[in-house]
């Protein structure tokens, strides 16, 4: 999930100059067009999505065209205002963004609950109307709060949100994020804590967004964790470790094996690419990442 500053700053630092980006984008579009012309298709065992914030310099319409060419079914972490553009290109938003407070100020503070509940009251019917599956939420930072108190407070808020999600058949997903590198002090930073929260809330419409990049940093043991807890995971994000760049052999995770593990659990949701392209052709990196995950 995108922060207000850190992810944007990272993208600006690693993306090349405007001329290089334009040339790379042109090349990517030609490659994608060639795929479309020859009827290249993905295998269909993974529903592929991508987080738009990683490609901020590419306008949404242009990005949607490229996403369709690669074979993606979704562009995510977007707002309700972006839905008509996605619909125009036959794309879903597999994870809808916009919850008040963002990452740092979330459901672990009782004083945040009213505005968060209001957001879900207003947004969930629209998400359901478009047929999109998930809306993201966050625990917020600890700020000296105990993990037990954070669990209790989050459960109180989510028990108010769950009936809305159940009514409209939309899943509310709390993202697991690392607190070592990117999101210092974030409370939902271990899968064990997130699973305990799911059990307290007790609704099939509240689950976790299991971010593979973040959880590799916090706890590792990715495949075993997925096998043991997949019933609590509604959505997955990728990213290379270390660095959060391409998911190829420049980083330590075996994404092909991880995707096979996800498929073997019977998962029918989405896997979204959320790495920050380091190479000068970001769309070629995206296409490569989708190919790696298309097991």
Question: Which residues does each PLM region occupy?
Answer:
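Active-site acidic/histidine proton-transfer and metal-coordination neighborhood
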Residues: 14-26, 40-42, 106-207, 217, ...
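Short acidic, glycine/proline-enriched helix-loop-strand junctions
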Residues: 84-96
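Histidine-acidic metal/acid-base catalytic patches
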Residues: 2-68, 132-133, 188-210, 214-295
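Active-site mouth loops of central-metabolism enzymes
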Residues: 49-57, 104-115
């Amino acid at each position: 999930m995108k922060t207000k500053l850190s992810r944007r700053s990272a993208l600006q630092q690693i993306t090349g100059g405007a001329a290089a980006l334009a040339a790379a984008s042109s090349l990517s579009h030609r490659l994608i067009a060639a795929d479309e012309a020859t009827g290249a298709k993905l295998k269909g065992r993974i529903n592929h999505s991508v987080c738009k914030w990683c490609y901020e310099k590419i306008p949404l319409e242009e990005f949607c065209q490229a996403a369709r060419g690669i074979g993606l079914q979704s562009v995510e972490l977007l707002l309700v205002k972006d839905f008509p553009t996605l619909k125009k290109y036959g794309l879903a938003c597999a994870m809808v963004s916009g919850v008040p407070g963002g990452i740092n100020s979330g459901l672990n503070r009782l004083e945040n609950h009213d505005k968060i509940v209001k957001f879900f009251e207003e947004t969930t019917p629209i998400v359901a109307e478009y047929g999109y599956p998930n809306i993201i939420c966050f625990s917020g930072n600890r700020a000296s709060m105990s993990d037990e108190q954070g669990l209790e407070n989050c459960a109180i808020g989510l028990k108010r949100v769950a009936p809305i999600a159940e009514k409209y058949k939309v899943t509310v997903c709390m993202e697991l994020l690392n607190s070592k590198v990117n999101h210092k002090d974030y409370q939902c930073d271990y899968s064990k804590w997130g699973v305990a929260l799911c059990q307290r809330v007790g609704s099939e419409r509240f689950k976790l967004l299991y971010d593979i990049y973040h959880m590799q940093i916090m706890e590792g043991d990715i495949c075993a964790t997925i096998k043991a807890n997949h019933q609590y995971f509604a959505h997955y994000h990728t990213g290379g470790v270390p660095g959060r760049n391409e998911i190829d052999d420049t980083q330590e995770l075996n994404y092909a094996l991880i995707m096979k593990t996800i498929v073997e659990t019977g998962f029918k949701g989405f896997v979204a690419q959320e790495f920050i392209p380091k190479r000068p052709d970001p769309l070629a990196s995206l296409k490569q990442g989708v190919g790696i995950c298309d097991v």
